[in-house]
Amino acid sequence: MSIKAEYIWIDGTQPTAKLRSKTKILSDGSRLPRWGFDGSSTNQAEGHASDLVLEPVFSCPDPIRGGDHLLVLCEVLHTDLTPHPSNTRALLRPVAERFAGQEPIFGIEQEYTFLKGDRPLGFPEGGGYPAPQADYYCGVGADAIFGREIVEKHLDLCLAAGLGLSGINAEVMPGQWEFQVGALPPLEVSDHMWVARWLLHRVAEEFGVTASLDAKPAKGDWNGAGAHTNFSTRAMREGYDPIITACEALGQDDKPLEHVRQYGTGIEDRLTGAHETAPWDAYSYGASDRGASVRIPWQVEVEKKGYIEDRRPNANVDPYVVTRLMVDTCCTELARREQI
């Protein structure tokens, strides 16, 4: 029986990478071979040396095609099998391995916005604006919710693929939604997030809309779209002092700027200090504070153990990058203080 394997990879588009995919027919799904592609057509190579390599790193059932068909997430390599500069997964791998003993795990909240043409779904066609933000967040009813049928289909597809989704909800702006992935280790949560994003774009195709990860899809008094990143280590899940250490590590010296510069395109447009954000150029942390850079959830403060939420990453952040930065910054300081 022939198997359709959809090879998925992250391209070299700047400033925000896009997903690409193509189908390989296999006689046996137990072995996923390397494959190649034209990097000159994906912003990853020039025409005179355009061959690049797809290295399978994660696979799951293809919930769209069904049967034994597969989705295959790949790293991009040069023909000498060294990582391509666009391959951010290769940079995460050694960091994840170095700090694996601290058992870091992540839950990432992926916000996104459905667009019909260049306007959010739910905005009046032909111009104008809907009612101000108030009733849309976790709302119900045709006057508040736009695109639920797409969201539900995406959720079903992700679960059928075995991805680690943990929930969905409507967000603050019309046509804006969120799904959550995790809690999982850094490589796994990032792999699952990229495949879930691919499925989101793929199912949106069928409904004639675009699933945008733009950080500020509607200018003015409308919420932006983020990827709030929840993080803990074993020590943080067992005590409060390591939680404070992690929060302080993220604010040390030039760490705030180092992080936000890599937290997605359009960070200054979204992190303004309004709409449940902290200013992009100021660092803060606090319990239950959605206006802080990093939030300590209320139950964590009460129980004196748990996790933290970095609220700065944009919806278009690369999960391989944000997990690498947080593991490196927090786990290095936790190790220095022997809070492991």
Swiss-Prot record:
Domain GS catalytic, first and last residues per copy: 88-340
Its EC number(s): 6.3.1.2
Organism superkingdom: Bacteria
Annotated localization: Cytoplasm
Keyword entries, A-Z: ATP-binding, Cytoplasm, Ligase, Magnesium, Metal-binding, Nucleotide-binding
Record GO cellular component, one term: cytoplasm
Binding site for Mg(2+): E109, E111, E171, E178
Pfam families on file: Gln-synt_C, Gln-synt_N
All residue ranges annotated as the GS beta-grasp domain in the record: 3-82
Needed co-factor(s): Mg(2+)
Reaction equation(s) it catalyzes: L-glutamate + NH4(+) + ATP = L-glutamine + ADP + phosphate + H(+)
Residues the entry annotates as binding L-glutamate: E276
Gene Ontology biological process terms, A to Z: glutamine biosynthetic process
Major site of localization recorded for this protein: cytoplasm
GO molecular function: ATP binding; glutamine synthetase activity; metal ion binding
InterPro entries referenced in this protein's UniProt entry, alphabetically: Gln_syn_GlnII, Gln_synt_N, Gln_synt_N_sf, Gln_synth/guanido_kin_cat_dom, Gln_synth_cat_dom, Gln_synth_gly_rich_site, Gln_synth_N_conserv_site, Glutamine_Synthetase
Function: Catalyzes the ATP-dependent biosynthesis of glutamine from glutamate and ammonia.
Family recorded in the similarity comment: Belongs to the glutamine synthetase family.
Other remarks in the entry: Two forms of glutamine synthetase (GSI and GSII) can be found in this bacteria, GSI is a typical prokaryotic glutamine synthetase whereas GSII is similar to the eukaryotic enzyme.
Subunit structure: Homooctamer and homotetramer.
Protein name: Glutamine synthetase
Organism expressing this protein natively: Streptomyces hygroscopicus
Gene, per the UniProt record: glnB
